[in-house]
Amino acid sequence: MMKTLLLLVGLLLTWDNGRVLGDQAVSDTELQEMSTEGSKYINKEIKNALKGVKQIKTLIEQTNEERKSLLSNLEEAKKKKEDALNDTKDSETKLKASQGVCNDTMMALWEECKPCLKQTCMKFYARVCRSGSGLVGHQLEEFLNQSSPFYFWMNGDRIDSLLENDRQQTHALDVMQDSFNRASSIMDELFQDRFFTREPQDTYHYSPFSLFQRRPFFNPKFRIARNIIPFPRFQPLNFHDMFQPFFDMIHQAQQAMDVNLHRIPYHFPIEFPEEDNRTVCKEIRHNSTGCLKMKDQCEKCQEILSVDCSSNNPAQVQLRQELSNSLQIAEKFTKLYDELLQSYQEKMFNTSSLLKQLNEQFSWVSQLANLTQSEDPFYLQVTTVGSQTSDSNVPVGFTKVVVKLFDSDPITVMIPEAVSRNNPKFMETVAEKALQEYRQKHREE
């Protein structure tokens, strides 16, 4: 008799495939009501995701407007910088024509300047740059022997540095523009779609995207070119067919931005001394010109800069002053261009980051491939509710809820008993935890 009673108790506790909460059975009707409440939360999150996508689209457009404004400023600064560089080169050419005037004086000073410059540079390199001192020393000696004191006198190193900087700046902007143009052509087509100009409706009841046929904005030669929204009015929503082309395009746009943006060879000047030292080390290894920046530490080198040849050629004073003025202007606009270029690059990275967010939003929604494939009307279906009394694996003080979300395998979530089954927040908490796990799983795939 006792065995029979125990058997009956066991059957009651496992009634209807384990759909029990302690000793109280959870009926099919209750499970259906819970599924309905949970699905409402999922529906709200889908709508939020779609709104989020549009918000990111708006941010991308705002960033693009800021980028255009910066590009206009860059073009203006570039024109002024190039004018100053041309003036500098003209002044340099005129000065070169009179370089023999003080040649003997300069050569004598140059012979005393070179040993000090080499020693100062090699000490710096050994202390800061460290690697390859022997090779650099040999290269530096050749460089100094081939250099002219007149080049030193008219700040040829500053001129060459400006010209090299100009070349690198132009290349950096070309790389960024190429990246943006590739991404922009994709985004232009993406954002022309009617989806981005309409408010998201209630996805739980009908497809908000099937009310109108989409115009063929995409180039028919594209692999993904097709009618993205071919669904007739009120046909159930299929997220995969709807969003996968969008998802593919966003991924392509992000790749187009990232591939080149992270390979820009130009390094923006940074105020910190250790960063400046790295730049000087690179210049010394490259062609020894970095050593000329140490001329202020050698007295005889400074004397070369102070040589006055005006007694032999009065016009040279004016030419040298013109060169000095144009150099200062060119350096000023080069620095301004650097600052604008760096801001421009930051805008590009911001756009890339926003595309990444857009990618993540679409990634989740576009994974809902079988959302309406089954006859089940619920996004979220509760299959089992249990507690520690009905399942020894459930921690004390928790309620175990097993759900199916979309086409997923069963997902188990634990809800603190402080949030009771009668609490309106119960199913919202269940749905939130289940959705977090669902999204995490798809991020890992």
From Swiss-Prot:
MF term (GO), any: ubiquitin protein ligase binding
PTM notes: Proteolytically cleaved on its way through the secretory system, probably within the Golgi lumen. Proteolytic cleavage is not necessary for its chaperone activity. All non-secreted forms are not proteolytically cleaved. Chaperone activity of uncleaved forms is dependent on a non-reducing environment. This proteolytic maturation is disulfide bond formation dependent.
Signal peptide annotation: 1-22
Post-translational modification Phosphoserine, affected residues: S133, S392
Disulfide bonds: C102-C309, C113-C301, C116-C298, C121-C291, C129-C281
Glycosylation sites: N86, N103, N145, N277, N287, N350, N370
GO cellular component terms attached to this protein's record: chromaffin granule; cytosol; endoplasmic reticulum lumen; extracellular space; Golgi apparatus; mitochondrial inner membrane; mitochondrion; nucleus
Motif range (Nuclear localization signal): 78-81, 439-443
Highest rank taxon of the organism: Eukaryota
Function: Functions as extracellular chaperone that prevents aggregation of non native proteins. Prevents stress-induced aggregation of blood plasma proteins. Inhibits formation of amyloid fibrils by APP, APOC2, B2M, CALCA, CSN3, SNCA and aggregation-prone LYZ variants (in vitro). Does not require ATP. Maintains partially unfolded proteins in a state appropriate for subsequent refolding by other chaperones, such as HSPA8/HSC70. Does not refold proteins by itself.
Family recorded in the similarity comment: Belongs to the clusterin family.
Name assigned to this protein: Clusterin
